[in-house]
């Protein structure tokens, strides 16, 4: 049953129906549409459009429909309805007859779908927050377990300075905490109820929209009917928040893919999250991490899609906005499974401490310590930086680490170098000197973990 047939005399093209119908996508809003309709029944009863008995009958029929569809979800798509609103209204009329035709009084599909979508975002957003918290907890547990495992830190993907695996974990803990905060903020801004805004100018019936918002567990009603039905900021913001979080997931995945490679071999991944090759028997591929990295692109694509759809739309509602859901649903699905998969990867991850330590001891990662040593002896840092660069060139030529130079050899570069230089060049010294808030010294890492666990 079309909800708009009276104006038209000709038949709708089958091709147009296929092109126009959104039920294959918006069927996911079924529960929200029923919940919103129940609240709307109470609202129109409060202004005398329907009687208390009629309101009760409508609400019972809607609740019965909810039970029926939850028992057999295929009912929706088999209906051939134009959209989820048409399906619910047609099913309601089939149950209660002409009474069902009264429910849409004062309501438009414009404020109806805006409400459904915000309800869906609130529900799915809460589930995503729970997933982010689970990933955060898993990463924090890994940081605590491997807080003192030494590994090289990188800039430009070249060994730079030694850090610990716990320090690396805490870097991503910080990122996911920002993701949690960002999502919570987005959900707060989306916590307003458009219902009662009508098609664009507001409903003609003087109902209490504050009560209507409260009935649907929104913090407040929206304040401008034009904005209410035109706004998809909450969709954009959820896609944007997901994109930033997926960027963090993708970067973490890339780090772990490298750490797991034969060239690094700092970590091993569990069999649960890896697969093999159809040809090469020795392969153990980090497919879970590669898919996280790959799915990031499709999330970005959906963000660009909704921004492009909305960028030139005049107020108020336009059919273009029907395209808001498919990308959003895919974003939420992709983000959710990537969060779950990342947590599973971390839960089975093992650090290969000897290999990671050996890599940290190579590549002249203690060069900065030698420069700092020269500074402690009175040499300006820029001069010390140049001197140590010359030492590194000589060490590369001799294929030895800095600490294997004799004192006499080191003095040819700077006469102020004494025997006390050698304790400064150990990995332990490199780490211990970074005993500042946010640094990689072991006490700082332990304090950071304890502070985050105490929250």
UniProtKB/Swiss-Prot annotation:
Chief place where the protein resides: cytoplasm
Domain of life, per UniProt, equals Bacteria
Q: Which UniProt keywords apply?
A: Amino-acid biosynthesis, Arginine biosynthesis, Cytoplasm, Lyase
Q: Name one Pfam family in it.
A: Lyase_1
An annotated Gene Ontology molecular function: argininosuccinate lyase activity
Q: Which reaction does it catalyse?
A: 2-(N(omega)-L-arginino)succinate = fumarate + L-arginine
Task: Name the InterPro entries for this protein.
Answer: Arg_succ_lyase_C (IPR029419), Argininosuccinate_lyase (IPR009049), Fumarase/histidase_N (IPR024083), Fumarate_lyase_CS (IPR020557), Fumarate_lyase_fam (IPR000362), Fumarate_lyase_N (IPR022761), L-Aspartase-like (IPR008948)
Question: Per the record, what is one GO cellular component?
Answer: cytosol
Q: Which family does it belong to?
A: Belongs to the lyase 1 family. Argininosuccinate lyase subfamily.
Q: Which PANTHER family match?
A: ARGININOSUCCINATE LYASE
Protein name (Swiss-Prot/TrEMBL): Argininosuccinate lyase
Q: Which gene encodes it?
A: argH
């Amino acid at each position: 049953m079309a909800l708009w047939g009276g104006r038209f005399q000709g038949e709708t093209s089958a091709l147009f129906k296929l092109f126009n119908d959104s039920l294959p996508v918006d069927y996911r809003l079924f529960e929200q549409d029923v919940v919103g309709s129940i609240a709307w029944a109470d609202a129109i009863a409060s202004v005398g459009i329907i009687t208390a008995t009629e309101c009760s009958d409508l609400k019972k029929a809607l609740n019965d429909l909810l039970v029926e569809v939850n028992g057999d979800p295929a009912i929706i798509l088999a209906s051939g309805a134009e959209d989820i609103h048409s399906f619910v209204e047609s099913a309601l009329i089939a149950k209660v007859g002409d009474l069902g035709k009264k429910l849409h009084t004062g309501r438009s599909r414009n404020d109806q779908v805006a409400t459904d979508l915000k309800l869906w975002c609130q529900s799915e957003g809460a589930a995503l927050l729970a997933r982010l918290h689970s990933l955060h907890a898993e990463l924090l547990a890994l940081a605590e377990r491997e807080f003192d495992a030494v590994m090289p830190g990188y800039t430009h993907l070249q060994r730079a300075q030694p850090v610990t695996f716990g320090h690396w974990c805490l870097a991503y803990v910080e990122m996911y905490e920002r993701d949690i905060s960002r999502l919570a903020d987005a959900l707060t801004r989306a916590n307003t109820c458009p219902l009662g805004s009508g098609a664009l100018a507001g409903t003609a019936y003087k109902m209490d929209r504050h009560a209507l918002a409260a009935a649907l567990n929104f913090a407040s009603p929206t304040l401008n009917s034009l904005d209410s039905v035109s706004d998809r900021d909450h969709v954009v913001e959820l896609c944007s928040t997901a994109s930033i979080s997926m960027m963090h997931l993708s970067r973490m995945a890339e780090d772990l893919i490298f750490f797991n490679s034969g060239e690094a071999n700092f970590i091993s991944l569990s069999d649960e999250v890896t697969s093999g090759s159809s040809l090469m028997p020795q392969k153990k591929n980090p497919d879970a991490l590669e898919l996280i990295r790959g799915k990031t692109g499709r999330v970005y694509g959906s963000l660009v899609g909704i921004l492009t759809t909305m960028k030139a739309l005049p107020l108020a509602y336009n059919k273009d906005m029907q395209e808001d859901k498919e990308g959003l649903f895919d974003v939420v699905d992709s983000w959710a499974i990537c969060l779950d998969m990342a947590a599973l990867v971390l839960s089975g991850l093992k650090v290969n401490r000897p290999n990671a330590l050996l890599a940290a001891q190579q590549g002249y990662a203690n060069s900065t310590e030698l420069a700092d040593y020269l500074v402690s002896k009175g040499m300006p840092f820029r001069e010390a930086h140049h001197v140590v660069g010359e030492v590194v060139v000589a060490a590369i030529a001799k294929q030895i680490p800095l600490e294997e130079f004799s004192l006499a050899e080191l003095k040819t570069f700077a006469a102020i170098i004494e025997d006390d230089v050698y304790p400064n060049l150990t990995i332990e010294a490199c780490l211990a000197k970074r005993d500042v808030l946010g640094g990689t010294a072991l006490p700082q890492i332990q304090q950071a973990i304890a502070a985050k666990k105490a929250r």
